[in-house]
Amino acid sequence: MRWCLFALWVFGVATVVTAAEEPHHDAAPQTDNEVDLTEDDKRAWSSLHSGWAKRAWQDMSSAWGKRAWQDLNSAWGKRGWQDLNSAWGKRAWQDLNSAWGKRGWQDLNSAWGKRDDDEAMEKKSWQDLNSVWGKRAWQDLNSAWGKRAWQDLNSAWGKRGWNDISSVWGKRAWQDLNSAWGKRAWQDMSSAWGKRAPEKWAAFHGSWGKRSSIEPDYEEIDAVEQLVPYQQAPNEEHIDAPEKKAWSALHGTWGKRPVKPMFNNEHSATTNEA
């Protein structure tokens, strides 16, 4: 820093000497825009430049530059973090470990851990509780719900009880009901519909079935009616074949009777003429 100031002083002295040795010329006429700077103004500007120029920034760098960051580093830098480490770092976690760490978990274990299982709330207390809900208590309850109780209930719902109920709903009762709905009842009903009463069926067959063994030939009847008038037919024929009369009467409505009225009309005409 001192060498820089000395160089500036030498440079200023040299410029002053050279300016004194140069011959003075007439000054050119100044315009309105030009400013005449005196020596005092130049010196003031150079003095101001020493505060804001690059050299002054270097002077300020002692507070803001790397050196100042190193100074702050004692609080925030690596060294400061190591200092804070006494509370938050590994050492402090080890200190907190007495409450929450492995050691503390062992201490808490006295209430919830394995050590308590070896004491009042462990297997011994479970065995004590087991006297009510465990195997022994289940055996005690077994008198009502276990196998023994099921055998007792068996008298009503078991095999024995089913045999007793079987008198109503079992095989015996079904045989008793069989008298109404079984084979016997069907045989009784068979007298009306079954095979046991063939004579009744023959009588019933007379209404719907074939009463006579020889079927009448209705074509021959039509031929006879066309050739011989119905009134001139012998009485024996009317008596022997009563179904012919009914068929002829029915035939007049549905059958082929367009030829028969012609003979009847001629016969009626001859009878009228006679």
UniProtKB/Swiss-Prot annotation:
Entry keyword set? Amidation, Cleavage on pair of basic residues, Hormone, Secreted, Signal
Answer whether the UniProt record assigns the keyword Secreted to this protein. Answer: yes
GO CC term, one of those recorded: extracellular space
Signal keyword on record: yes
Q: Name one GO biological process term.
A: instar larval development
Q: Which GO terms describe its molecular function?
A: hormone activity
Q: Which residues cross the membrane?
A: none
Residues bearing Tryptophan amide? 76, 100, 145, 157, 181
Where is this gene product found? Secreted
Domain of life of the native organism: Eukaryota
Q: Which residues belong to the propeptide?
A: 20-67, 77-91, 101-136, 146-148, 158-172, 182-274
PANTHER family for this protein: REPETIN (PTHR14054:SF14)
- Its biological function? Inhibits ecdysteroid biosynthesis in the prothoracic gland of fifth instar larvae, with maximum inhibition during the spinning stage. When administered to day 8 fifth instar larvae it produces a significant delay in the commencement spinning behavior.
Listed name of the protein:
Prothoracicostatic peptide
Query: What species does this protein belong to?
Result: Bombyx mori
Q: What is the lineage of its organism?
A: Eukaryota, Metazoa, Ecdysozoa, Arthropoda, Hexapoda
